[in-house]
Amino acid sequence: LQYDTSDLIMLQNILLQKVNAAKLSVIRGHEVYPSNGDLFKRAGNSYDMAERKYPFLRYKNPSVKSSFYGWFGDYLGFTGYYNPFTGEAQVNTTVPKFLQPYIATHEMAHQLGYAKENEANFVGYLAAVNSNDSLFHYSAYFDLFIYANREVYYFDSVASKKALEQLNPEVKNDIVELKQFDLDHQSFFEPWITWLYGNFLKLNQQPQGIHSYNEVVGMLVAYYKKYGKI
């Protein structure tokens, strides 16, 4: 997917507006993050709603659960995974709550057959933002803004920093919380696990390795150019 710096900045600024608006909706609605069981049920509901618009997102036989290795995964950098032997979507429910809705829809995308990480990110986004759940909207837009902002930084650090400054204060607080969480769970093993996983992705037709996740940015640019919305 081809895009230039102006496309990246355009996408970043749209996501900036989306994540700020979603956070305001969460605050004004006094939304409270649900229990794990309710979270997974609501993730399934998000696919049910998205299916009305995108029939290919039909999600049958829900099977999502908390990862038994959540605490261990914190130190290895895992937020969730798809178990190909059981067909279950596993969500690390020890990570910050605001990440978990999008993690759930991402892992459920793998269950639908979207094996590549950029595809699972995009399908998870479609499910999350087409739901009527502001917690899912915020979770997806938060993660996607971070992806886009990081990409912009490589080409225009001034534009990247300017966007960060324009975030809602509560969104900034969540970024601080996420950074602190990552700092608290640094380990000697994480760089090695990241390297191994990156090579695993390359062996499975994802040549960008660990950076495959970021390729959702190009898909979002293409989607916006075709449909005029994110």
Segments the model singles out, each with a brief description of its role:
Residues 1-8:
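Alpha-helical transmembrane signal-anchor/signal-peptide segments
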Residues 13, 17:
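Cysteine-nucleophile amide-bond enzymes
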Residues 19, 23-26, 47-54, 93, ...:
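Sec/Tat-exported extracytoplasmic proteins
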Residues 21-93, 97:
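Auxiliary, metal-adjacent structural segments of Zn-dependent hydrolase domains
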Residues 93-101, 113-117, 134-138, 189:
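Solvent-exposed, acidic/flexible segments
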Residues 102-121, 125-126:
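Active-site recognition of the HExxH zinc-binding catalytic motif
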Residues 122-177:
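Active-site/pore-lining binding-face segments in mid-to-C-terminal subdomains
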Residues 169-230:
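Pan-zinc metallopeptidase signature
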